[in-house]
Amino acid sequence: MWVPTLSSSSCSSDERDESSGEAALTPVYLNVYDLTPVNNYLYWFGIGIFHSGIEAHNLEYCYGAHEYPTSGVYEVEPRNCPGFIFRRSVLLGTTSMSRSDFRSYMEKLSRKYHGDTYHLIAKNCNHFTEEVCLQLTGKPIPGWINRLARVGSFCNCLLPESIQLTAVSALPERLEFSDEDESNSEASSVSDEEGSEQHLINVADREIVYLQNKPVRLTREEIP
């Protein structure tokens, strides 16, 4: 009886499909930053005051505070968030989400995380990264990242007021915002030469951006 066999070309095609499927899985990292040098001591006790950002496709997104009812989500250079001290990067898992889908997801999620709703205990940067991590990998972030917030929920006076008002609101010196906020560009001192599709907010030369500064928005860029 004649039994059909797969040709070498079809086999190689299947192998390419499998390899492309594997290549489509992108690592997801949690980039952890210190808010204070005290973390060098607290870290060994399983606690600390940490800021975190989520990284995939060489894009890192974070969540910070400001006083406006607009998104507090912003994009930074991976592992280099201004105003914070990078500590370590944690591999959380992988995602099959494409770069364009990842960016679209972050833009949609940014509407939920307004700068004026940031709360150090109930809705901070680590809550944001955990929601993203659950969506992308199905796993939560490590418990030690946000442990102090859980402890602080039982003791609101746990953290100094100075840390609450400054450290959690550090934002990058150049922040991007979306097309839909083009009407706000004049208020944020954006030059007309930068075009209508992408705008950058120039922040004063200092590491910490306080709550009275301009609102932050994501940018909608063309994906190659």
Curated annotation (Swiss-Prot):
SMART domains: DUF862 (SM01179)
Organism: Arabidopsis thaliana (Mouse-ear cress)
Primary enzyme class: hydrolase
GO BP terms, alphabetized: proteolysis
UniProt similarity note: Belongs to the DeSI family.
The protein's Enzyme Commission number: 3.4.-.-
A Pfam short name: Peptidase_C97
Superkingdom in the source lineage: Eukaryota
MF terms in GO: peptidase activity
Active site: residue positions: 51, 125
Protein name: DeSI-like protein At4g17486
Sequence segments annotated as region (Disordered): 176-201
Domain PPPDE: 26-163
Keyword field: Hydrolase, Protease
